[in-house]
Amino acid sequence: MIFQSFLLGNLVSLCMKIINSVVVVGLYYGFLTTFSIGPSYLFLLRALVMEEGTEKKVSATTGFITGQLMMFISIYYAPLHLALGRPHTITVLALPYLLFHFFWNNHKHFFDYGSTTRNSMRNLSIQCVFLNNLIFQLFNHFILPSSMLARLVNIYLFRCNNKILFVTSGFVGWLIGHILFMKWLGLVLVWIRQNHSIRSNKYIRSNKYLVLELRNSMARIFSILLFITCVYYLGRIPSPILTKKLKEASKTEERVESEEERDVEIETASEMKGTKQEQEGSTEEDPYPSPSLFSEEGWDPDKIDETEEIRVNGKDKIKDKFHSHLTETGYNNINTSNSPIYDYQDSYLNNNNTGNLENLKLQLLDKKNENQDLFWFQKPLVSLLFDYNRWNRPFRYIKNNRFEQAVRTEMSQYFFDTCKSDGKQRISFTYPPSLSTFWKMIKRKIPLLSLQKTLPNELDTQWVSTNKEKSNNLNKEFLNRLEILAKESLSMDILETRTRLCNDDTKKEYVPKMYDPLLNGPYRGTIKKGVSSSIINNTLLENWEKRVRLNRIHTIFLPNMDYQEFEQKAYTIDKKPLSTEIDEFLTLINELGNEPKSSLNLKGLSLFSDQEQRRVNSEKRTKFVKFVFNAIDPNETKSGKKSIGIKEISKKVPRWSHKLITELDQQMGEFQDRASIDHQLRSRKAKRVVIFTDNNATNDPEEEVALISYSQQSDFRRGIIKGSMRAQRRKTFISKLFQANVHSPLFVDRITPLRLFSFDISELIKPIFRNWTGKEGEFKILESREEQTKREEKKEKDKKEDNKRKEQARIAIEEAWDNIPFAQIIRGYMLITQSILRKYILLPSLIIAKNLGRMLFLQLPEWSEDLQEWNREMQIKCTYNGVQLSETEFPKDWLRDGIQIKILFPFCLKPWHISKLYPSRGELMKKQKQKDDFCFLTVWGMEAELPFGSPRKRPSFFEPIFKELEKKIGKLKKKYFLTLKIFKGKTKLFRRVSKETKKWFIKSIGFLKKIKKELSKVNPIVLFRFKEISESNETKKEKDYLISNQIINESFSQIESGNWPNSSLIETKMKDLTDRTSTIKNQIERITKDKKKVTPEIDINPNKTNNIKKLESPKKFFQILQRRNTRVIWKFHYFLKLFIQRLYIDLFLSIINIPRITTQLFLESTNKLIEKFISNNEINQEKITNKKKIHFIFISTIKKSLYNISKKNSHIFCDLSYLSQAYVFYKLSQTQVINLSKFRSVLQYNTTSCFLKTKIKDYFKTLGIFHSELKHKKLQSYRINQWKNWLRWHYQYDLSQIRWSRLMPKKWRTKVNQSCMAKNKNRNLNKWNSYEKDQLIHYKKENDSELYSLSNQKDNFKKCYRYGLLAYKSINYENKSDSFFSRLPFQVKKNLEISYNSNTSKHNFVDMPGNLHINNYLRKVNILDIERNLDRKYFDWKIIHFSLRQKGDIEAWVKIDTNSNPNTKIGINNYQIIDKIEKKGVFYLTTHQNPEKTQKNSKKVFFDWMGMNEKIFNRPILNLEFWFFPEFVLLYNVYKIKPWIIPSKFLLFNLNTNENVIQNKNQKQNFFLPSNKKIKNRSQETKEPPSQRERGSDIENKGNLSPVFSKHQTDLEKDYVESDTKKGQNKKQYKSNTEAELDLFLKRYLLFQLRWNDALNKRMLENIKVYCLLLRLINPTKITISSIQRREMSLDIMLIQANLPLTDLMKKGVLIIEPIRLSVKHNGQFIMYQTIGISLVHKSKHQTNQRYREQRYVDKKNFDEFILQPQTQRINTEKTHFDLLVPENILWSRRRRELRIRSFFNSLNWNVVDRNSVFCNETNVKNWSQFLGERKPLYKDKKKLIKFKFFLWPNYRLEDLACMNRYWFDTNNGSRFSILRIHMYPRLKIN
């Protein structure tokens, strides 16, 4: 068995090896390429089909195979690949050959005249067949294009080692495939010939010569196919001759530019020259080739080779220059005057005045331009046919006004090559292409062995070792610092200090940060100072040295140079003495630096010392000198004249050699210097519309005010350069005339949904359900506000869409007129013809006809009235865009640009004119409408509202006549029928009465007695009572159902609609309520009536005798039964309806009652719990006088929200983060025995974070907290993908102002946001409370339906406080150290009413939405001045006060001016009793104001403190649909904040009482001044704030149980008292709200912008149009008055004065002030805090936020006793906590970056799982505790925090990432951050 399995295993492995072998893969790819059919197959097929002899077949097959072999070889051999893949190859060779072949096949006899020999090889046709098959293999394939195959082959080629074997096997596979293919083809052809059924075909038999004709015309068929191929390729490849040549930028500009660039940096690329002359220019100027060959432009090798070719094909080739002088005799024969290198430079050498250089260059350029005209045909053929500098591809030209030419976009940013890094060969994708080319050239010239000798590995090893050593040193230093810190040493030397450059030691003045090189690196700028002669000499010397070396290198790389020969001649001098010779020679040059070069006498110079001269003979000396002079460029002398300094490092960007202008630029008259040049860019179709011309200077076109009107048509050619190809778009089509994007037909159904198949199921079901229940009326009534608004919105939407459709149609017509040639001329003439016809022929003839008709009907003619109206009609000529001119004046160039004719007061023929004595109201309205009436004339003489609009309906002439006739006929008919009716009725009645009355009277007397008897048996009272009761029950149920549903719908609609207009909010709501109540009443009445009809009742009426008859006579019983049956069948439908209705009501009532019962139980249990806790705590509290049952104010909301959940299927609550903590706590408090340890994490996080376990979820499900959908939604575990989770749960990148106060470790960070009430407020508070109490009690008497009364604000707050205390205690029941609630708020100690720390506490009752994004308006001002802002006022949740609506709906912020109720004062702790005024809203903003200052008529203005341009005062701003306890949600959805931070009062500080604002006004000027206090050695981290020390000492001195307050807080208290009690003597009194708002705005925002109102914009444009018309008129007064009457001109805009104050402009609504969205330049600290602050979300917010704050412990027995921690270790531990959460902060930034990069280079552990083990292994984390030096209770929280810190790169900064990104990945833009795969560096090992 073992042997068998062994064999089997071997077999499998052998098979796998065979399958994966190179040969098999090659064969596979070869077989695949068989199916790529190209044009060459046509020739092969033709040779096989045409039976032209075996020679042709053989030659075709041979050519076919040879061509494919060439293609395969080209895959491996790069030069061949380049040669075949070049665009010139196909352009120059293949296309002409194709055309020639086409001509050859069609004119065969032309070549057949002299062929007599029978030698097959000399026969031209056989060679042609071979060539055809060979050449057409190089063409692209038609079927199964081989691009995919080629890519696969390339990928495999890149992977496999044995490339030649792979290519060979690929070719063999291809060969086998093609042999099989050809054999199969042969067999098919033979079968066709031999098949009898094909030959005996009726059609073929009837056409005897069909096969012969087919065979004869086969050549023609193939030639047609080839011609199609030819056209296809012409379409793909740009024709070299037909494409448009672009005029290049002026040569002189380029020349100067390139000169400057060469001086800046030798290695940068000079401008790419497009044509030969430019190349000549560069070679003549430089004795070495232009460095653009080696430029870092990311070229592919094709482009480099092209430039080589162009350079090689030049007129004077550099190789010839050098080759002619480097002869075997050495340098003896050199003569500078004859040398082409110095042909224009010797005059410069022999000239003392170097200033003639520029003139000389210009002369040379002129000469060159002359030569260019003469010898244009000397251009090389390749660059003529294929100019790579031309825009052949459809590139967009990106215009850049700052530079001369556009940047080339197709240059790749990446270039792959191998390089050595860390001593290993690696592939780099940012390898400089110039270096790669350079290295290839070196390899070509120098033998590989000598290269390998010169490149030892010592350098690499040395580099690696030094890098390791440096990183180890850094690590050691870092660890040493950490260890010292761990020992709790307080010396400040631990932190690495940052050295600053100091100006003055005594004053300690530092250089500004910007210019400090120690902070910002060297300042890169030119140092403009006088240069000493020694510096000039040194730089000259350096430049000479450089140029010697440079030219020496360039001579190596000149084409076709015999390197060995050159080396022999050059190095005939001994190498050792040569170095000394060079040294001495250079010192000599240095001495002679200042002398003119012409005075150098080369023959008489003694270059060397005497000793050296003995060794070196004279021949060697002269040889050396001439070699040096040949290498040195004498041109270098000019460097002495240039300013010496640090040049700015810049990379040369590849640019096009053309500067192009658009059609629009040409039209607008820009680029006047190039006015003669035609535009090269296709721009969007546009028209220049002149709206105003200055009459004084009509000739000057610049005085015209013009607009550009763009065409609406989709133009995909826009921005494409003329002559360039169009993009080859596949699978796209343009179906409409105007289409924004091109779409693939594949997605047509996505773009326009098919009407047949699109339907909404819910919409279909609704009517069925309604019919089934039979409650259509109720459905209509109960249709919520939401649905009503939806319907209205749909109507509006349809209307808008209709208008949009009309507008599109109008634009389409306009575009059509624009596009058709000569259309405007035709249209113009047609319009003028129509206007003349209308005015002088059509209308007068109509007037005549009408009046003649009137005369015929004996009516008075109305000549005067009609003629008056006809005269009133004005036909004004307008420009194409509708700007009015006058009746006689035609617009400029109207035949070309177009014309419109506007008809003012268009004439309308009326059958009669109404008497002017008594006009009706309707006629008056019509007249008013006609005043504004105007229209535009269409081409067909119709009237349109807008130019090119659809013709409008004119009032019919005959319609009023017919109406009048109808009225008269109707009146006559009425009269006639009335008389007839009366006459008939009277006669009938008289006859009938006489007969009937007699009979009926006699019978009725007999039955009266019987009825009496029957009634005495039955008790009628019982029957009636029973009926009444059942009916009343029914109606009650109905009412209940209706009202309950009504409430729900109403609340939803009111909450959800967030954009009601500000002004009429209250009125609309009132109106809605009244409407709704009335409709409900009507509906109930109607339902009761319907029921009466529906239920069949026995009518027991003693007056009627029918029933008695029926009961008495047994004969008629059967008939009665029959009738009853039919009636039952007839009314069964109604019975069914009634039954369903009952069922429906009962179900709904039961559902509605469930939440009521549950909430009652719910609240009772919580009351018991809370009272139990409170009773324990009452010992240390003050005696609370007003003991009552706690009524929570959110009961009504619970009802509603619970019902909403049941109604909405709770799909919203699948995300755990939507559950408010208050709700969770309530649910938990209901359960009797509960294990709270499981839920501590849940209850403490603001979002139920990724740490939530599944068992907790299951437990919650059993408790009924979560719903069943959550069961399947497993949250990702924390370890799977930390990065994703981290981002998912910490997405709040915008820092709010309050988070600033939390994060920045400054003085104000330690302040506790505490609301300190002033002493004098106690009295006012009591007064106000009593007043409110009276009001509430009074109101409660009036309306008993109010659920709960808020009798006392103080008591309510106490309740909420107890609730919060209980919540916190139960959550932190294990961890007593975490408790922060010290005692009840209203214990009077030092008159401070609230003493808990609102900044450190986590309020369960302030639960903000976690998913709202804010626009962050952070400014430098706020950051600098935040300390002062915090000193002003604090705003916590107690400012927002509660009030209950009757139905408990939360609705809006309601603005109440104080003049609405003179008794309602606005004070600190006063909630407005809004219910009395109107039953709206729960939360009301109150403002701080002195009671003395509150006057009866004063108005309060709430300022929108976030700076958002939203008017929030009179409309609802939050959708509370998701919240269970909305009373505890801050009603501000824009300002997002963490739940444990309370917004402070400075956000809503009062305008009138804030003295700080006014006092600080003068100080704000100093915001941007640098502070004078400088510290010489500044620590990287901020030092311990002074406030902390003060507070620490303060605590130590006190030592009692009083709450901890810093000195700042006591100051704050004073500030409160002062600001509130002072009279308003220093306060600025504002005249109006606008002024106050403006003033505050200017204080808040130093920078702002003024924005026009949008509505004003439109009115402005209308005004401008009218002004344009008025300017042209001679007597404009009449038109002015009429235009004002028609409201075409707005006088309020005309009255805007230049010197109007800003407040007036704001009042008028002309200007809107809004803050500028500044991109504030933040320093590194800000970015660090923004990045790191996100990860600081932690369980113990208390500790995270207040690291410097004293921890407090709470005794187990008594929660409210406050015990202080011993003070010994406090300062040290807390300081280290902050620094060591980010241990790297010890080092300063540059060293930190170095540490990271070095650690990165040496990191060996790349495995992701291992790297993340940091987060899972607790022992690793625990190692850090020795650095933290903290107490044990803190440790458990810090551990997780450290985990967070090491979760990312520790304290990584954004700028570091950006730097590393650029450094490693060569990305120069931020969009490629996705490339980043940053590896966290390995953990530091602690010994």
Curated annotation (Swiss-Prot):
This is Protein TIC 214. The chain crosses the membrane at residues 18-38, 64-84, 87-107, 124-144, 172-192, 221-241. GO terms for cellular component: chloroplast inner membrane. Residues 248-300, 785-805, 1569-1603 are annotated as: Disordered. Residues 256-268 have a biased composition (Acidic residues). Pfam families: Ycf1. Involved in protein precursor import into chloroplasts. May be part of an intermediate translocation complex acting as a protein-conducting channel at the inner envelope. Belongs to the TIC214 family. It is found in: Plastid, Chloroplast inner membrane. It comes from Solanum tuberosum (Potato).
